[in-house]
């Protein structure tokens, strides 16, 4: 993810550090940044926040209501009351019930409906681009370390690919060579 962000945002500093305060200070003092955007920063209260932004998946807004590791929530649903802007993602239909649920906790935040739409396929190493119809009729195996692998897999299916095998890892998973080799060997047999 950080590599992808840095590649697609020239001139924007992308820092990765478990100590976000240290990274924030470095960005401001050494790199001259005047704005910091944190991934998963809503629950990170050690840095002063000017604007609280939250993304809510409209297809599974609050999961089973439990916090990690028993559920998908990083903090209780009621804490959404701190949000200034709520992006309601994966909106493909009527989301009024989800908005009503959000309004139970936050009556003032702006709610923005959005949807993920792929535009192009890109080789991460060569940066070569392919049109979306390149997937039409292709048989695919997926290897993913993202929060919502089913959404990724369904996007491939909607683009006409036949997804026959999926290897899913936790969000932000760091692949090691044995995992990649396993996937390559598994797909070679198909």
Question: What do the PLM-derived regions correspond to, one by one?
Answer:
Residues 1-106, 113:
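Phosphate/Mg2+-binding loops and adjacent switch elements
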């Amino acid at each position: 993810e950080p590599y992808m962000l840095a590649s697609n945002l020239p001139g924007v500093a992308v820092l990765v550090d478990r100590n976000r305060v240290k990274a924030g200070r470095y960005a401001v003092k050494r790199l001259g940044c005047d704005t910091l955007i944190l991934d998963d920063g809503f629950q990170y209260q050690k840095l002063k926040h000017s604007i609280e932004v939250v993304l809510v998946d409209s297809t599974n807004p609050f999961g089973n209501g439990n916090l990690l590791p028993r559920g998908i929530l990083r903090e209780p649903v009621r804490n959404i009351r701190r949000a200034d802007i709520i992006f309601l993602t994966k909106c493909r239909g009527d989301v009024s019930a989800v908005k009503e649920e959000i309004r139970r906790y936050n009556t003032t935040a702006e709610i923005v409906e959005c949807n993920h739409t792929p535009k192009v396929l890109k080789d991460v190493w060569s940066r070569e681009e392919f049109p979306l119809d390149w997937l039409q009729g292709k048989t695919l195996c997926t290897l993913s370390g993202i929060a919502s692998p089913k959404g990724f897999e369904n996007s491939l299916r909607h683009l006409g690919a036949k997804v026959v095998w999926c290897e899913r890892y936790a969000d932000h998973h760091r692949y090691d060579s044995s995992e990649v080799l396993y996937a390559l060997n598994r797909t070679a047999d198909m």
